[in-house]
Amino acid sequence: MKVQEGLFVVAVFYLAYTQLVKGQPRKECQTRCGNVAVEYPFGTSPGCYYPGDESFNLTCNEQEKLFFGNMPVINMSLSGQLRVRLVRSRVCYDSQGKQTDYIAQRTTLGNFTLSELNRFTVVGCNSYAFLRTSGVEKYSTGCISICDSATTKNGSCSGEGCCQIPVPRGYSFVRVKPHSFHNHPTVHLFNPCTYAFLVEDGMFDFHALEDLNNLRNVTTFPVVLDWSIGDKTCKQVEYRGVCGGNSTCFDSTGGTGYNCKCLEGFEGNPYLPNGCQDINECISSRHNCSEHSTCENTKGSFNCNCPSGYRKDSLNSCTRKVRPEYFRWTQIFLGTTIGFSVIMLGISCLQQKIKHRKNTELRQKFFEQNGGGMLIQRVSGAGPSNVDVKIFTEKGMKEATNGYHESRILGQGGQGTVYKGILPDNSIVAIKKARLGNRSQVEQFINEVLVLSQINHRNVVKVLGCCLETEVPLLVYEFINSGTLFDHLHGSLYDSSLTWEHRLRIATEVAGSLAYLHSSASIPIIHRDIKTANILLDKNLTAKVADFGASRLIPMDKEQLTTIVQGTLGYLDPEYYNTGLLNEKSDVYSFGVVLMELLSGQKALCFERPHCPKNLVSCFASATKNNRFHEIIDGQVMNEDNQREIQEAARIAAECTRLMGEERPRMKEVAAELEALRVKTTKYKWSDQYRETGEIEHLLGVQILSAQGETSSSIGYDSIRNVTTLDIEAGR
């Protein structure tokens, strides 16, 4: 009996302790005031709100209006927020600038604090206000609004008629003081007052005409307060906290203390012992069960039950179970399908292997057909040891030219097409796709590769390598971006604006490169097709000699070779044309024609030239003989200061184009004379430094070709090219 009495006393003591610690409200507590619900820990009478903190004690007046202190309550959130209405501050003036009204807001929030969801706002012209707060520490800030008319932009509080700044959380004392810079005399008609107030973010939309005049007659604004239980954390209160069943505790984000919330699957008031009640997901349609399943509510959750003949998957969906006989046929079908797929995959792999082998054999066939064996033989055989030819792959060339797209075409000619290519390292090159038809042209292509690979000169286009795996071979050059000398002198793509200094320098550079080929290369090289269309110019107008498809290496023990005549009409050496004997003087003659083109600006062979032979060499001689030398010189070139230089250049051109090769100078001598001519000044008179006109006439007069030499075409794969078209065979 004594044990039972002891247990009864303990139970009574526990219930009294629980009521004291958790402070649960009485059953008769008011739960609504007007249209605002009053929920624990808030209350309106003793025993109905959280004990020990008068901040939770709200007042419901006779008009059914709920107040927190002197602030009307809008609503409350059990997650830790209370919305109230806070009076605005203002200062007003008459038209003379005399103060007529002043209200400064001063508010104490008890144990509650300002939320960071509020904004400090100032409305008025030439106005400013201060916000002073205190809590754990003091904080002050201010805002300035400037304007001179009521036509400021609506909806914006950026400082013109309206200013708005954030407010930090955690402060329990607020003081707002409005001011004016000049007491509003100039704006009194539309803005007699300065207004300052706190307002919840997004709850004030500025309208200049209404707000600057009387702030739309609004005296209070919604403000968000943070609240929490006590001054300890969840860990410190442990089970002694106010949180009820099926709830959890979390530390307040607005300052000290803690708040409560219902667990997932429960809803209600977490501050009451049984405030968090289970949510019936099956009734509230908060479940995700499929149409074939049945929802079953459980405490804090739910289950999706599948009917007979169905099974539940991971997404709470019910799928029909597979019958044994159906499963057996499914196995057979899947086995057959997988087996067939394996066989087809094997056949596909075999086809790919065969296709790869055929492609490899085809590339090897093209390699041999395009002279790969010949190239390897010549590189590895007797001859110069400095040959360095890079072999590019078919795949690399296709990617570099974007599949040989027509937008990449730089030009087309008798020997093929030239594309602009971009290599993987982003370097730009010119890719020449040869147009070959027989064995001799393959040999000429390989010859061009070998010749260019041995040349290292700044005025000779540099070959980077070749690709022989394609149906027609490809040659990869450095990219020269400013066209040919022919384009600049006669073409329509560029203005014919080369000055005499440009032309003399170009002539000197070409002469120097030919002298190098004839005298300084490991084995002498005769270009055999020197013409303006085979001289490229870069962006600095530096000359680059190109197109070595017709070039020949001269053995060290020979001075000339007997070959099939090859070249271009107008530039072709008459002696070589008549005898078939090729030597370095053939290049000298062709260079002389190029020099005449630079002097005259006229084409080497032109059938539309009036009163002058069609061949430029004959035309030059005829003009000199008839005292019309000045007429043949390009008008853009000659002036009073360079007549002697042009006369000297004409003399060099005349010597280079003599009929007999033995009477022509060597390219080394021509290059030296042109280089010396470049550095000469014009301070000496014409008569003191240069030969008489008669001597020029003699030099040019003996060069007139016969009618046969003038109109006959050269023999070879490049002999019938039209010199009036854009020729870029050199790999631009």
Swiss-Prot record:
User: Which residues face the membrane's Cytoplasmic side?
Assistant: 351-732
Main localization category: membrane
PTM-bearing positions, type Phosphotyrosine: 477, 576
GO terms for biological process? cell surface receptor signaling pathway; intracellular water homeostasis; oligosaccharide metabolic process; response to salicylic acid; unidimensional cell growth
Q: What's its membrane topology?
A: Single-pass type I membrane protein
Q: Where ATP is bound, by residue?
A: 410-418, 432
Record: active site: 529
Record EC number = 2.7.11.-
**What reaction gets catalysed by this protein?**
L-seryl-[protein] + ATP = O-phospho-L-seryl-[protein] + ADP + H(+); L-threonyl-[protein] + ATP = O-phospho-L-threonyl-[protein] + ADP + H(+)
Induction and repression of expression: Induced by INA and wounding.
Q: Which GO terms describe its cellular component?
A: membrane; nucleus
Keywords, alphabetical? ATP-binding, Calcium, Disulfide bond, EGF-like domain, Glycoprotein, Kinase, Membrane, Nucleotide-binding, Phosphoprotein, Repeat, Serine/threonine-protein kinase, Signal, Transferase, Transmembrane, Transmembrane helix
Q: Which InterPro entries match?
A: EGF-like_Ca-bd_dom, EGF-like_dom, EGF-type_Asp/Asn_hydroxyl_site, EGF_Ca-bd_CS, Kinase-like_dom_sf, NOTCH1_EGF-like, Prot_kinase_dom, Ser-Thr/Tyr_kinase_cat_dom
Q: Which range is the signal sequence, renumbered to this chain?
A: 1-23
Entry comment describing in which tissues the protein is expressed: Predominantly expressed in green tissues such as stems and leaves. Detected at organ junctions.
- Residues bearing carbohydrate: 57, 75, 111, 154, 217, 246, 288
Q: List the disulfide bonds.
A: 234-249, 243-260, 262-276, 282-295, 289-304, 306-318
**Function field:** Serine/threonine-protein kinase that may function as a signaling receptor of extracellular matrix component. Binding to pectin may have significance in the control of cell expansion, morphogenesis and development.
Assigned protein family: Belongs to the protein kinase superfamily. Ser/Thr protein kinase family.
Q: Which protein are we looking at?
A: Wall-associated receptor kinase 2
Q: Which gene encodes it?
A: WAK2
